[in-house]
Amino acid sequence: MTAPAHLRVLIAPDSFGDTLSAVAATEAIARGWSAARPDDHITRAPQSDGGPGFVDVLASRFGTVVTETVAGPLGASVSARWLHDTGGEVPTAYIECAQACGLHQLGGGPTPRTAMAADTLSLIHI
């Protein structure tokens, strides 16, 4: 059986752990596919489970990324990004809480004390 001359291809990966974001993985797969089959029509749709990379996935489709300095889970200032979408009926903010209070912000790893200190309040006040 031979493949049709032109395929419609959907590329929709999530991130590859800490190695590639969903957006970067989508682009890498699309480049490889296009190199092998340049006449195919590719639709790119990076995915996210709502954790790290969520804002990047949405930003690949719509909205404006805004960077703010907020209090992290241990009280130190950290940089966090959120997506501002004004294209719908009402302006909408998409917040990736892991940027401000994710485990990576705890340094040496969570302990019962530091894990309870995680707070999303500073992101909500933006």
Predicted features and spans:
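Conserved small/polar residues in nucleotide/adenosyl-binding loops
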Residues: I124-I126
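Glycine-rich anion/phosphate-binding loops
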Residues: P112-S122
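Actinobacteria-biased recognition of intrinsically disordered, low-complexity terminal regions
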Residues: M1-L7
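Glycine-rich nucleotide/cofactor/substrate-binding loop typically near the N-terminus or early
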Residues: R31-G108
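Short, contiguous strand/loop micro-motifs
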Residues: F16-G17, H41, T111
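Generic N-terminal amphipathic, Lys/Arg-enriched alpha-helix
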Residues: L7-D18
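Glycine- and acidic-residue-enriched helix-capping/strand-helix junction motifs
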Residues: T19-A24
